């Protein structure tokens, strides 16, 4: 049942999504939750969303899809606005926060068990790759040659910088979560002192990134990331058409996973022939070409140039659900008319 809630615990374990802005983002959440319910029908799902999106949920009769509705103020209706303040939304004892452009691929029970070892964590890599906060093209070579990343770490007193991937965040410690968020805000204010490129410079992006600032905050507080790349037990993997086999409804998903992090980082390049060339070149070195076919818990459509299959899937799911609701209403109307005539 859909209902607004106040700041109190709503259960032991639960999922939290966020939705604001264009109605298509609500469609994405609906599609993601549909895939989650293939594997987990018990844990509650809360949606933090604006009033406009609440009205759309009620208009289309999707109340039963969410267990709880959380009012999202406009000041938090952005990537940075929400993820630098998500300590305000710990509505369960143990919380998994999810991006809307995620498809669930298998039962998450063992993922929950693994995350329980942490008070707070975000999926990521111990060492950030070459593309983290940098140009998503061959232009990243300039940052490498000029040692910009190294200078950023020295300036902020860091000895390492993890790669945070905030498509999946976990928390069961409100105080620690607030500390991370507050420090991330401070890091973002000092962006001019870093080598990071504004996310708005990427084609199709109109919001600033929260990831590098959260990663720097976690490094400063020495909080470990939850290993993003774990082979067969990976919590989430990027959707890369070049490396992913799947059916139209994403009920069958297999990702080609390169065991060497450096080789796997080539997935970020937009041009397939360049990716293929680099992978083949480095595969000459023993071990560099080792790979496996894996099914992650989540398939994340985080790369803008790889989102189209998810857009098509979410459109189809939304249209089918709306059609089902209309059919149900029509059937109820016929039953009521028959009863009155009788």
Give residue spans per PLM region.
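N-proximal low-complexity "stem/linker" segments adjacent to membrane-targeting elements
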Residues: 1-30
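Active-site-proximal specificity loops/subdomain of glycosyltransferases
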Residues: 51-90
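Conserved donor-nucleotide/metal-binding helix-loop-beta segment in metal-dependent transferases, i.e.
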Residues: 106-144
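Short, acidic, metal-binding catalytic loop of nucleotide-sugar glycosyltransferases
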Residues: 35-43
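A glycosyltransferase accessory/donor-loop signature
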Residues: 1-12, 155-162, 171, 175-342
